[in-house]
Structure formats: C-alpha cells, structure tokens
C-alpha cells in the first residue's frame, strides 16, 4: 500500500478538517458516561450479562442512525490485538476497553467523530471529537446523541444525584470535557511549571495525550474537568472554555516573546529538528514526538514554509507502535519500530516536498 493511501485511510476524517485556534488547540472532546437501569454495572456484571447488554444496545441503536450518522458496531473479542491498539492510538476507544473489558464493543460513526463505547467502566461512554477549539459544538452533538439514546433505552438516573456511574467522580452529569493543547512556548519558557498547579486548583486535570498517568510528550497536554456533580453541562464546559482561552493567550504571548528575544535560536531549533526528522534512519517515539513539536511550532510561527500544519497531528498518530505494525503488516520489535518510524517520517516529509 502506498504511504498516501495508508495515511488517507488511517487518519480519521474529522481530523483532516480545520477548527478555530487549531494552531494551539488540536482537538476538543466531550464524553458522557451512562448506565442502563435494568443491567448490573460492568464491574459487577457476569460475562453472560455483558453479552446481553451488547445485544440490547445493538438491537436498539446499532441498527438505526442518528440524523445522517450511521454506526458500525465493532466487538473487542473479534479484533486482533493490534487493531485494538490502533483504535486506542486514534483516541476512539480507551485502553481499558481494549484490554480489560468483558465483551466490550464500540459503535463508530463513518467520520469517526462519534464513538460509543459499550461495557467499558460504564455501560455506555458517548464520545464526540471536533478539530480545534469547539467544545460547545461537541457538547451540542453529544447531548443530541444522548437524547436519541435515552429515547430508546432506560438510563440509571437518580433525582438527587443525577446519572449514576461506576466512578464517583462521574456521578451527576457524567460529563468529561477536554481539549488537547500544543503548548511548546510555555514549556520552553518554563511558565508551564507555574501554570499547571494553578489549573489543578481550579478543579481541572492536566494529563498527557493518552490520558491518566501518561507523560505530556511533544508538549501536548490534555486538559479536562474533574467533578461532574452539582454543575450543569453548560457550566462545566464554560469553566473549561475560560481556562483554555487564557492558555491560548498565554501561549501566543510566549511565542511572540521567543520570536522577539531569541529568533535565531528558535529558527536553529526548528531547522535542526526538521533535519533530524528528514534524514534520521532510527528514531525513538519520544524523540520523534519532541522534534515534531518543534517543527509544528516553526510552521505556526512562519519560520518553516511549505510544510502542512497537520503534520504533527498525523505523525503523532502514525508513528505509534500499533500504526507502525499495521503499515508494516507484521509484528515489530522495538528496534524495528524505531527504524520503521524514521522511514515513515522521511517518506511523509518527502510527500510534502513533492507537493510544493
């Protein structure tokens, strides 16, 4: 398969679109946790009960559509390990669903902007992904899907507590709003060390791109709400929006200061990173991610011409182990992955040169 075709098939269609403030906010996500009234929660359910839940959801949801969105139901038990790994790398399912769920499944829309996980920590996890800074738009879509589902199945709901969930932090609205942000200038100027504790004090959580416990590789940070009880969905999203808008302003100001005070050093860093990506024969995931961050910053600041801004979004995913093995068509050792990663990045940058 040609690299162009592999990329076009591998990258989710929603990721190829532009969104507001996409130089800093790569994506916005709304996730709703829901459970069904007549079934035991996944943590307590037997294997047979988990099977019955999937059949129940399939009967009521998978064979119908929400507006123009048709869904495909994929069962974890039917998938090879690497296919599940790829879905995790695309942020379409959680590691928990891929590795630990009893008869887990996922319903995916055609453009992969909507995924509904089944038998994860909760019976249903409704997720909507948008490019750029579009939290409000993602909330509107997620709420619409939630209403559509609620018209077909009975949710576990308490008048005082709201939606009942497996984890106490999700009780209430069951809503988790998050954004993925690229904050290289705040990291370079070390302002991030002062900002992150302040964000945590506001009741928000900062993680790396693969969720809880993951490192913020490539200067990419996932910022989300923590508690869902006692606030409306709109208030939760508005609180997060306010913090994200401040971070956007601070990152832009830090980028401007770096350009004014250290332009030559910044150019050198960007071009060195581009040179390593364009010519290296072996590259580890961590180094590749950092160099891609430098290159993306150079593109956004106009220091590097003729390279697509989407290259960070694309290669952050395509150079993960699951995708590398999918492209190779075989299981790879760590050393083989480092070699393949370097080759794929070189080939992707060559495509940029050929298109200019």
UniProtKB/Swiss-Prot annotation:
Gene Ontology, cellular component aspect: extracellular space
Single biological process term from Gene Ontology: phosphocreatine biosynthetic process
Motif (RDXXRA motif of the pArg binding pocket involved in allosteric regulation): 337-342
PROSITE patterns: PHOSPHAGEN_KINASE, PHOSPHAGEN_KINASE_C
MF terms (GO), sorted A to Z: ATP binding; creatine kinase activity; protein kinase activity
Gene3D superfamilies, per database record: Glutamine synthetase/guanido kinase, catalytic domain (3.30.590.10)
Positions with a binding annotation for ATP: 27-31, 91, 125, 176-180, 207-212
UniProt entry tagged with the keyword ATP-binding: yes
Activity regulation behaviour: Appears to be allosterically activated by the binding of pArg-containing polypeptides to the pArg-binding pocket localized in the C-terminal domain of McsB.
Family: Belongs to the ATP:guanido phosphotransferase family.
HAMAP family: Prot_Arg_kinase
Name this protein carries in UniProt: Protein-arginine kinase
Lineage: Bacteria, Bacillati, Bacillota, Bacilli, Bacillales
